[in-house]
Amino acid sequence: QYQDFDITYFVSDDVFPTFEVFDRSRFGDMMIQQILPEKNRWCWLMQFMDGNRLDLKIQPVSVVPDYLAEDTLNTILLDKTGHYTNLTATSDRTHWVQRPTQSEFDDSITEFFWVSTYVLKGILRGELLYANTFFESIVREELYRLLTWRIGRDTDFSLSVGKAHKRLPAYFEGIESLYDLSDLTGTGQALSTALKMANDLLPSLSHDLQLTYDVASVERTTDYILRQL
C-alpha cells in the first residue's frame, strides 16, 4: 500500500499510435489521473483509491536503447523479443550528484545571496508571502545545491541525495528549521540560518572543489542582511 510504480510498455512502432486511447481501468479503482503529452510516448500518471500510484508510459520499441541509457534505474521485467538479455545491473548512477563547473558554482552562489536580499526586503516590509516565496523557491533551493555538492565531494560524487533532497537531514543539522516560515520572525530566523550554513560551507567547499568565489561580496551581503534582521 502507498507504493509508487513506474512502468513502461514498449510496443511495435506500427501499433504505437493506437495506444492513445489505451484502456487504463483494468489497473484499479482510479481516484485521479494526469495525462502528459510527451514526444514519442503516451504517459499517464494515475492515483488509485487503495493508495497506490502508477506512472504508466507506452513507447515504441525502437526507443528502448535510448530509454535504458536515460536512467540506469530502469530494468526489464519481460522481454518478448530476446534482444535485451545482457544488461548491466541497475543502479542510481544517473541520479548521482554531479561535480559543478566554475560557472555553475558562481551562478548558485550569486543567486543565493542576491535573492536573499529580496527575502530581507519582504521581511522589512512586512510582506510574509513575498519573503517566503523567494526563500522557498530560490534561496533554500540554492543552499541545497551547495550542500549537495558538499556531500558529492565527500563521497567522490558517487551517490544521490534522493528526490526532493530527502537525505540532506542525515548529513546536516538544522535543515528542518528552514521550514518554519509561519510568520516574519520565523522567516527571518530561517534566512539567518541559511546564511550561516552557506558561509560555514563555502570556504572548505571551494577549496576542495578547486573553485573560486567572490569572498568579499559574500561577506558584505551577509553582514548587511544580518544587521537588518
PLM feature segments, named:
Residues D50-Q59, S91-D92, Q102-E104, L181-S182:
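A general structural signal for short secondary-structure boundary/capping elements
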Residues Q1-Q3, I7-V63:
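Metal-dependent nucleotidyltransferase catalytic core
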Residues V11-F16, M31-L36, E70-T72, D79-H83, ...:
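Glycine-rich loops and low-complexity Gly/Arg-rich segments
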Residues M30-K39, L78-A89, E173-L181:
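Short secondary-structure transition/capping segments
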Residues W96-L229:
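Conserved nucleotidyltransferase catalytic core and NTase-mimicking acidic/glycine-rich helix/loop elements
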Residues N74-D107:
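A short, charged helix-loop
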Residues Q1-Y2, L68-E70, V161:
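Short aromatic-enriched loop/helix-cap "lid" or pocket-rim segments at secondary-structure transitions
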Residues Q47-L87:
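Acidic, glycine- and histidine-enriched catalytic cores of nucleic acid- and nucleotide-handling enzymes
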